[in-house]
Amino acid sequence: MAQTTNDIKNGSVLNLDGQLWTVMKFQHVKPGKGPAFVRTTIKNVLSGKIVDKTFNAGMKMEFETVDNRTLQYSYEDGDNFVFMDMTTYDQIMVPKTLLGDKAKFLLEGTDCLVSFHDGTPLSVDLPGSVVLTITHTEPGLQGNRSNAGTKPATVETGAEIQVPLFINEGDRVKINTEDGSYTGRENN
């Protein structure tokens, strides 16, 4: 649907030269001299490449409609992850490449937001944080305090993260899915 650059918002999907781009940040700028413009940071939906792009204000551009659905992760099948729509019980194959490094925090039963364009999955967003069980870590030394440093630990999905020295095997920890950082310990 044709609109202008004045309609750009965070999350808008633009069709530029036949490729889909998601607007991550935008700013309408009206300088003292010269015409107004829109400064954006956009992300290529397929490749994940992020670029800064400036558009003249009022310029016509093609916006695309994206369907967002909450799906539950079921299992891995070759080069795909299989998600289930819990309202229709349809199984949907999503290429592993759409998750990238975040796949290491994907646990069976996790609800994810999957974006579709013309029935094709474009992106998968995990929850902001997940709770996983520590399956392997070296024991901390006696007298360690919560701010005394970190050690490597492996969680149930096989991902390796850094945790405080007081964390032990079997502990459930909260992990930020954006950067893989430890954010806290959950009550068992």
UniProtKB/Swiss-Prot annotation:
Family annotation (InterPro entries)? Elong-fact-P_C (IPR015365), NA-bd_OB-fold (IPR012340), Rib_uL2_dom2 (IPR014722), Transl_elong_fac_P/YeiP (IPR020599), Transl_elong_KOW-like (IPR013185), Transl_elong_P/YeiP_cen (IPR001059), Transl_elong_P/YeiP_CS (IPR013852), Transl_elongation_fac_P (IPR011768)
The alphabetized UniProt keywords are: Cytoplasm, Elongation factor, Protein biosynthesis
What Pfam families does the record point to?
EFP, EFP_N, Elong-fact-P_C
Where would you find this protein in the cell? Cytoplasm
User: What species does this protein belong to?
Assistant: Bifidobacterium longum (strain NCC 2705)
Q: Which GO terms describe its molecular function?
A: translation elongation factor activity
CC annotations in GO: cytoplasm
From the UniProt record, give the pathway where this protein acts. Answer: Protein biosynthesis; polypeptide chain elongation
Family named by the database record? Belongs to the elongation factor P family.
Q: What is this protein called?
A: Elongation factor P
Q: List, alphabetically, the Gene3D superfamilies matched.
A: 2.30.30.30, Nucleic acid-binding proteins (2.40.50.140)
Q: Give the UniProt record's GO annotations in the biological process aspect.
A: peptide biosynthetic process
What SMART domains does this protein's entry cite?
Answer: EFP, Elong-fact-P_C
State what this protein does. Involved in peptide bond synthesis. Stimulates efficient translation and peptide-bond synthesis on native or reconstituted 70S ribosomes in vitro. Probably functions indirectly by altering the affinity of the ribosome for aminoacyl-tRNA, thus increasing their reactivity as acceptors for peptidyl transferase.
